[in-house]
Amino acid sequence: MGSGDAENGKKIFVQKCAQCHTYEVGGKHKVGPNLGGVVGRKCGTAAGYKYTDANIKKGVTWTEGNLDEYLKDPKKYIPGTKMVFAGLKKAEERADLIAFLKSNK
């Protein structure tokens, strides 16, 4: 996976993620959990958010690599997730979005 463009990643977040997620560290949850500081956080552990058992049991710590895999096809990576988003098929868009999420600490 190449290094992404965080500015473009922010645009992708606003277009495709912001309906269900916030990204400011410590921000409120929406339909989905707040994603501020998600890189390096264990899956299913954002305080105050009710995750599915599938997300909790996955037990991974989010890295660039597994976020890329998840964002490509969320329901394949975590069967039983309640995330309805179909995924980002373009590797460049995933790299940009991950660069944006990493920049948000």
UniProtKB/Swiss-Prot annotation:
Q: Which PROSITE patterns match?
A: CYTC
InterPro entries per record? Cyt_c-like_dom, Cyt_c-like_dom_sf, Cyt_c_1A/1B
Q: Which domain of life is it from?
A: Eukaryota
> Where mainly found?
mitochondrion
- A Pfam family cross-referenced in the UniProt record is Cytochrom_C
Chain residues that bind heme c: C17, C20, H21, M83
Keyword Transcription regulation tagged: no
Q: Name one GO molecular function term.
A: heme binding
One term under GO cellular component: mitochondrion
> Gene3D superfamilies this protein is in?
Cytochrome c-like domain (1.10.760.10)
Question: Where does this protein reside within or beyond the cell?
Answer: Mitochondrion intermembrane space
Q: Which keywords annotate this record? A: Electron transport, Heme, Iron, Metal-binding, Mitochondrion, Respiratory chain, Transport
Q: How is it modified after translation?
A: Binds 1 heme c group covalently per subunit.
Kindly list the biological process annotations in GO that this record carries: mitochondrial electron transport, cytochrome c to oxygen; mitochondrial electron transport, ubiquinol to cytochrome c; oxidative phosphorylation; regulation of compound eye retinal cell programmed cell death; sperm individualization
Q: What does this protein do?
A: Electron carrier protein. The oxidized form of the cytochrome c heme group can accept an electron from the heme group of the cytochrome c1 subunit of cytochrome reductase. Cytochrome c then transfers this electron to the cytochrome oxidase complex, the final protein carrier in the mitochondrial electron-transport chain.
Give the UniProt family note: Belongs to the cytochrome c family.
Instruction: Give the free-text miscellaneous remark of the entry.
Output: There are two cytochrome C genes in Drosophila: Cyt-c-d (distal) and Cyt-c-p (proximal).
Q: What is this protein called?
A: Cytochrome c-1
